[in-house]
Amino acid sequence: MIIGIDLGNKSRNSISVVDGETLLEWSNIKYDPKTTTTWEHRKKIIKQIRAYIEKYNLTKDDYIIFEKVNMFMRGVNSRLANIMSLAFIQATIINEFSDVISISEVNVMTWKKVVLGNGKAHKEDSVAFIEEHYPQVDLNVIVEHKRKETEYLKDDDTADAICIGLYGNMVDKKKLDEHLVNYT
């Protein structure tokens, strides 16, 4: 079984639980700097992952998979603040769960190539894939603004988290083990 995590950015993180091609659960955890600290946000992520591990009795034979933090995205330097935010979340996950479950990282282009058939696929492609194959997942998001019109968006973070979970079930365990990041 795979827990797929899209670290998104500091304000949004999505988690999926996938067994083979079966999507068992998914969640989206939002961060609001007005009501919580980044540490409290990381604790919410850990709490959700722990709940999934306990509910499905996951062990070292199962995996958490998250995206590798990239220093460059499409030839452009990533912002240091973004890199640090993602690295803190990864470090927290590794610290909390290394003794419990296998933890592997995957390059964004790698999972996109395996799941979507194109390593350079865009967010819209993962959304379209999930809407086609998992119509029970509502990816519609309404964002209300004080000074602008309401926006109607798609939750590409949840789509990516599900695709990452699917990736873990589509590749050989040896491939996942090559990219383990557990400290134990």
Enumerate the predicted regions with their spans:
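Phosphate- and other anionic-substrate recognition elements at nucleic-acid/protein interfaces
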Residues: M1-T184
